[in-house]
Amino acid sequence: MLRGEKIALRARSEADVPVLHAELHEDVATRSRADSRPWRPIASGQGSPYAVAEPSDGAAVFSVERLSDGELAGEALLWNIDLHNRVAHIGISLRPSHRGCGLGTDVVAVLCRYAFAILGLHRLQIETLADNLAMQRAAMHSGFVVEGTLRHSAWVEAEFVDEVVLGLLATEWRMT
């Protein structure tokens, strides 16, 4: 288990799946903002994007637990991990009741520590919708810098929207 100030990142359990699925996948508006594929109904089970999966070199998937009460707060992951080039992408998704209280900032910080200090990665990247200011603030708190804008690169609820690309190198990272 990886601990921050407010959260812990732990392995996904079967008990997490229905909660994450109900609150993160079934919220069509939120899910369509977080996924590059169109939303479609999926039963909460093995087809769920939150199902427990075998460990892989290409992704590190965590459940986010709030330390104050042990409650499941959401999911966090390093995805598209490339061990040769030592790069990966960060993704987080918090349950609605756990947003806006600083957990995302702590999640990003713990993922950075895992990526740089444990995996020995060299670069992390985040792509987020341009209006997702909370994610941008959380990333910049850990040292990420805005590297550019991908204009009209995401199709979200009947319109094209911009994405912001943020990056962080191991040499720029400050361990907190």
Explain the meaning of each model-derived region.
Residues 51-63:
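A short helix-loop-beta-strand connector motif used in the catalytic cores of GNAT acetyltransferases and
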Residues 1-27, 61, 65-176:
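Acyl-donor (CoA/ACP) binding surface of acyl/acetyltransferases
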Residues 41-43, 54, 70, 144:
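Compositionally biased, low-complexity repeat tracts
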Residues 28-50:
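Conserved GNAT-fold acetyl-CoA-binding loop/helix
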Residues 21, 50-51:
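A generic alpha-helix structural signal
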